């Protein structure tokens, strides 16, 4: 048996080797078989079966699908009627959860943003060495259309990027390669090179990192002795207070107390 077969009045789904399609976990699995979309449970029992037809919307397993006239699933960006949609590789319309949610995706040399219904609401060409405004953010790519990441200099100004997007939302200390930097509104305000097992002073705070065997800098976390003093760090930053107040922190089954 292969695909959907009826046994004793019940429809089951079988793999190509004749084995009943069962699994140990709860939930519903889906498959395509003989131009049908099929969903089945962990016992291999068919829950839903919908015939695949070309050039029409198909509702299956509470999702929408679209196939061309040769019954190939739509993938990526496609225009149907007066609207443009984004589809996953299996032909499923890429809905994004809840109303008001916007998801972005790169297809070739374009960026697309689609809403919770899968409808494309914005698109922009990706060009190199030029600021691109998209979905409320700013992006930058090099001449090979590779997105900027980490600290980059544009027109003499240092910026910080996350996968091509200017990190305008940050107001914190970040890492970029061998550099520790304070970033605000996407710009690098202050920076310092990492030092192995040496205190680093940045933006009014003190940091402590070490170089691991893989060649990456990692923050100290917890109590460590530096220059004969017992200091307490959380993710690399020395913990201090603005007064003589004693502060505490519970970590790794220990309660630590520290002052300014």
Where are these regions (language model features)?
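Extracellular adhesion/carbohydrate-binding repeat motifs centered on closely spaced tryptophans
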Residues: 1-260
């Amino acid at each position: 048996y292969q695909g959907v077969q009826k046994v004793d009045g019940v429809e089951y789904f079988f793999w190509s080797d004749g084995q009943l399609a069962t699994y140990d976990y709860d939930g519903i699995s889906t498959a395509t078989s003989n131009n049908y979309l099929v969903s089945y449970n962990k016992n291999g029992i068919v829950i839903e079966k919908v015939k695949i037809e070309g050039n029409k919307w198909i509702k299956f397993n509470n999702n929408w699908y679209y196939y061309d006239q040769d019954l190939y699933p739509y993938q990526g960006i496609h225009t149907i009627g007066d609207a443009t949609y984004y589809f996953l590789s299996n032909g499923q319309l890429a809905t994004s959860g809840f109303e008001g949610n916007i998801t972005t995706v790169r297809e070739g040399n374009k960026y697309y943003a689609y809403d919770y219904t899968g409808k494309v609401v914005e698109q922009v060409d990706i060009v190199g060495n030029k600021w691109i405004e998209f979905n409320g953010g700013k992006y930058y790519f090099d001449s090979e259309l590779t997105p900027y990441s980490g600290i980059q200099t544009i027109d003499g100004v240092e910026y910080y990027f996350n996968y091509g997007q200017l990190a305008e939302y940050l107001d914190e200390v970040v890492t970029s390669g061998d550099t520790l930097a304070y970033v605000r509104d996407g710009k690098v305000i202050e920076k310092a090179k990492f030092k192995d097992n040496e205190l680093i002073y940045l933006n009014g705070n003190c940091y402590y990192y070490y170089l691991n065997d893989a060649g990456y800098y990692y923050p100290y976390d917890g109590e460590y002795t530096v220059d004969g003093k017992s200091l307490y760090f959380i993710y690399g930053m020395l913990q201090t207070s603005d007064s003589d107040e004693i502060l505490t922190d519970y970590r790794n089954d220990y309660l630590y107390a520290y002052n300014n």
